[in-house]
Amino acid sequence: MRIIVLIYLAVTCLAKAQKPETTFTIDAGEVVGENTEFWKAAGSDHLFYHVTRPSGQSLLDRMEATKSHKFLRTHHTFVQDKKKGVLRGQNVYSEDKNGNPVYDFSNVNKVFSEYVKRGLKPVVEYDYLPQQLENKTNEGSDGNDEGMKMKNMGPNNWKRWSDLMKAATQNFIDVFGEEEVRTWYFEVWNEPDGWPMDQLDVFYKMYDVFVDAVTSINDEFRVGGPACYHEYFLRPFLNHVVNGTNHVNGGKGTRIDFISYHIYGLSGKWLNSEPHILPQVQRFSQSILWLKRLMNDFPDLKGTEFHINEWGMSSNFYRTVEDHPDLVYRNNIESPLFLVKLVNSLYQIEDKYNFPISMLLYWGFCGEADANEVFIGKRELTISGNIPKPIQTGFEMLAQLKEKRIQVLRQKKDSRFGVLATKSGNGEMALIAYNYNETDIGVENKEKVTLQFTGLEPNSTYHVKQTKLDQNNNNTYSAWEKAGSPKFLSKAEIAKLKGVTYLDSRQKEDFVTDNKG
């Protein structure tokens, strides 16, 4: 007996309708590509703080158990600061009384060990400048226009900066082994968009020195960047790595194994102001297509991995629904719908334009799990009591997809409904169907959808298991609302909400194919 797993997100009626307005035909015999699971990634400004706390341990355990994530990324690998009362990072560099460097990677190793023992992989950022290496001149800048706070400047001693990165890289080999570290990714900075435009060459030198430092320890380690969010920054950076003069060896260009970029549905600074802006998947699709057009200008980079290693419906991690009611979409079913629709759209771009995204990294972790109140509207994956928000449930649903993507044909062009279909080598299939139009706030669409299958095994029995994420199923936020939206949860209420997210298949049925499959 073959198994078909059907996962529905806000599909109110998915059946064999007499006069369906939307029909999808799934051809099980037509493989269109690999399911690369590029979305299995998350991050936060505060991982070095949260990972070793009970809330972080709980989420890491859940990620391992559900296979919802593979990569984790965070800032402040080299320095520590405090934002909104929460520590970020650690100080790994100091100098003794004689001015000699002293390294302490103990906390970094401790945090990364928590990843590795669960099969998770770090995206390592070598940032920011330790205080002893800061340039004391007035050159450089502070932060960027999205609220990041860092010193955008070159070090006062380039050799010591290089030696720090070499020491960190060698430390990872000593602790985790070369084979493991070869599966990681390395960057030198985060969102350098605030770098003074007349000093971009200093950042290019930062990148060149970083690449030399990491690859001099092991040439197989993967290096890239620049983790920016403005195209006006990305283009000259790519021109440097392709055509510029390398600041280390004087040659042409600099190695880059992956290109990283950030996209959000809207800036957090635009919330609660006119004009009213809603995050839309189309914004991401258009940005990716513009990036594809940009990459055409650099044929030498063809085939280089492209990472969106920060994304979210809205930027800004500390704003809440109390002050910004629009952020309810960070709590409710819109977040997983947005995620699934975005994943499907990026696969469509890969198939149509031959521009695959190798990583899509959601910026959120467990920052709400340490709060007393629940569903406060931050961009996290869990809330108080380590209860998963619907966005985490969306990741867990995507994790049920199989290895090969199969063809899906639709009767008409439509941006509301979509189906992502996959199969495994043994013939099992898993499909996700969604119903989501970003501009229809609170509108429940009643249009029926039909799924037609071809290419199945003739005269065979298929067992269908159905899982739903909607207002009544597997939805912690709607369950919380039905319980009266209590600000604080009792142990019994926590246990009840956790029980909502076990993704049980409540509807099961069998069907037999005809002699044509």
Where are the predicted features?
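Flexible glycine/acidic-rich beta-alpha junction loops that bind and position SAM and/or redox cofactors
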Residues: 131-134, 269, 314-318, 367-371
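Non-catalytic accessory regions flanking glycosidase/transglycosidase catalytic cores in CAZymes
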Residues: 4-6, 15-185, 201-231, 250, ...
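Flexible, active-site-proximal loop/turn residues at the rims of small-molecule/cofactor binding pockets
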Residues: 48, 78, 192, 265, ...
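Noncatalytic carbohydrate-binding groove/subsite architecture in carbohydrate-active enzymes
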Residues: 199-356
